[in-house]
């Protein structure tokens, strides 16, 4: 997050009315003429007068964007939109046209000529904080405190936010749930076109997935408040986390006659995949490249449950494939009492355990509807391999775009570091390795390495995942000081090819 200190001045100084309107005009220039016209028409249609000025009240905002009541986020987003205006009265929320325009510019990515991406993220997260309006009244009027903030580095600004702000954990959970439910929403569509996502039995699965994502944002499971810095850091590792909000709020830039028209869906039902599902696809689209976003560009190349649990079968399918690929591993955690009926589990003898397993929160922190086995059974791990696979008896493959990730029971992303290039290993006599190393003399695989690493045995039956500091892969954001490892029994393993030649549909990314 290296930013020049002067970039923050525009956010925190008290602007005059003329400066505020001039900046708003700069935002509006990033909208095309038709978008500006539609925005004004839509605003006029639902506006009411307050002290001679046209505004949107909360009911108008809620009616227009149609966020389902089950999500309970309309007041949250209305307050966020109001915070982009100049009215500092904590007891009076009023959404003016200029505030709505600035809100839309930030959420839909039309802020590039005025704010950096980091500044936009900062403004959005600040607008989610319960203490934000009070902060603007009491702190921004203190010129000395403003000056200190303006001339601070990013770390000081993050610390300042954490000391003065707080975001309700329940709001961020609902936000995660909304994003998973509208992951296929396209610009110009209303949420009503996807209302079934909030009604069918899948909604329970989406609630559980939202909890996984929430745990990845904040390690403070027992706290009802999330630190703003946690969200800032999470957006760095999941840069497309809020992209669906851009599509949701772009509705204001389309003519009213088009709001209930569903855009032709180009997404297949994923029937040909063993592990990949619409929900898992929604999660990986938070952080993987845009070429992954369209399902019609993805192909299931290898499924262990179909092609066989064999490194030879995996080699036949993968070593002639030249595009990037996604590895997904669906597994059950191995605990002390676990016994395998198919093959003795000798992993502990081969690779002695160094760290305890990771327990996500406490029983009280996990909703009862998610089940008693939430902590210690299912695990879903994966890797994005940016280069072609190859036999690596002597070395490794992959590049700096390679990454590891976990989706269940916690959503985390582990990016490649600059410490070494031991990203991926494919050795039929050893198995699959990520972030491991080899002895310089004997060439034997070394499992006792620092950093984040993953190993799958040569029978594709069991493996381990370790999170312990920096190595070939970085530790998860907000979990840098956590050290743990998981042993697991593989239920299925799938490799998915990514067609990078298919054109990616353009979309405005808000964050």
UniProtKB/Swiss-Prot annotation:
Disulfide connectivity for this sequence is none
Predominantly, its location class is: cytoplasm
Q: Which UniProt keywords apply?
A: Cytoplasm, Nucleus
- Please give the superkingdom of this protein's source: Eukaryota
Q: Where is the TLDc domain?
A: 274-499
UniProt-annotated location(s): Cytoplasm; Nucleus
**GO biological process assignments:** response to oxidative stress
Q: A Gene Ontology CC term for this entry? A: cytosol
Q: Which InterPro entries match?
A: TLDc_dom
User: Per its UniProt record, what PANTHER family does this chain match?
Assistant: NUCLEOLAR PROTEIN 7/ESTROGEN RECEPTOR COACTIVATOR-RELATED, RESTRICTION OF TELOMERE CAPPING PROTEIN 5
Record function comment: May be involved in a process influencing telomere capping.
Family listed: Belongs to the RTC5 family.
What is the designated name of this protein?
Restriction of telomere capping protein 5
Q: State the organism named in the record.
A: Schizosaccharomyces pombe (strain 972 / ATCC 24843)
Q: What is the lineage of its organism?
A: Eukaryota, Fungi, Dikarya, Ascomycota, Taphrinomycotina
């Amino acid at each position: 997050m290296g930013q020049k200190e002067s970039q923050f001045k525009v956010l925190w100084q008290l602007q005059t009315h003329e400066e505020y309107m001039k900046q708003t005009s700069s935002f509006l220039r990033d909208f095309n003429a038709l978008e500006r016209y539609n925005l004004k028409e839509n605003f006029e249609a639902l506006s009411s007068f307050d002290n001679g000025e046209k505004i949107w009240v909360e009911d108008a905002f809620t009616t227009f964007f149609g966020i389902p009541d089950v999500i309970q986020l309309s007041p949250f987003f209305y307050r966020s939109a109001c915070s982009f205006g100049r009215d500092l009265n904590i007891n009076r929320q009023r959404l003016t046209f200029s505030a709505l325009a600035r809100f839309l510019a930030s959420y839909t990515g039309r802020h590039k000529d005025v704010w950096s991406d980091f500044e936009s993220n900062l403004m959005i997260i600040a607008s989610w904080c319960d203490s934000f309006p009070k902060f603007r009244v009491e702190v921004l009027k203190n010129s000395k405190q403003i000056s200190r903030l303006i001339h601070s580095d990013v770390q000081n600004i993050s610390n300042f936010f954490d000391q003065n702000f707080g975001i309700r954990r329940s709001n961020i959970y609902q936000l995660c749930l909304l994003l998973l439910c509208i992951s296929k929403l396209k610009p110009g569509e209303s949420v009503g076109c996807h209302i079934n996502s909030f009604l069918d039995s899948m909604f329970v699965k989406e609630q559980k997935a939202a909890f996984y994502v929430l745990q990845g944002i904040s390690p403070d499971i027992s706290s009802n408040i999330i630190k703003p810095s946690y969200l800032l850091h999470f957006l760095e590792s999941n840069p497309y986390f809020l992209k669906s909000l851009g599509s949701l709020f772009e509705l204001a830039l389309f003519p009213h006659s088009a709001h209930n028209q569903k855009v032709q869906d180009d997404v297949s039902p994923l029937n040909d995949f063993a592990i990949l599902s619409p929900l898992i696809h929604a999660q990986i689209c938070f952080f993987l490249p845009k070429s992954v976003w369209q399902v019609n560009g993805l192909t299931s190349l290898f499924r262990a449950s179909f092609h066989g649990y064999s490194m030879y079968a995996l080699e036949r399918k993968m070593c002639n494939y030249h595009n990037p690929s996604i590895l997904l591993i669906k597994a059950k955690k191995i605990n002390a009492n676990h016994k395998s009926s198919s093959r003795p589990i000798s992993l502990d003898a081969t690779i002695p355990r160094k760290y305890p397993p990771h327990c996500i929160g406490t029983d009280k922190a996990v909703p009862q509807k998610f089940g008693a086995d939430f902590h210690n059974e299912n695990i879903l791990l994966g890797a994005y391999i940016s280069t072609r696979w190859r036999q690596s008896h002597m070395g490794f493959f992959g590049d700096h775009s390679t990454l590891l990730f976990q989706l269940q029971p916690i959503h985390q992303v582990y990016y490649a570091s600059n410490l070494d290039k031991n990203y991926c290993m494919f050795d039929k006599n050893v198995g699959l390795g990520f972030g491991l190393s080899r002895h310089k003399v004997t060439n034997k695989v070394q499992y006792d390495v620092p950093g984040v690493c993953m190993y799958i045995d040569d029978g594709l039956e069991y493996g381990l995942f370790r999170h312990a500091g920096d190595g070939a892969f970085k530790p998860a954001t907000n979990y840098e000081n956590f050290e743990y490892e998981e042993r697991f029994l593989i239920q299925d393993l799938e490799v998915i090819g990514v067609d990078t030649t298919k054109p990616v549909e353009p979309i405005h990314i808000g964050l």
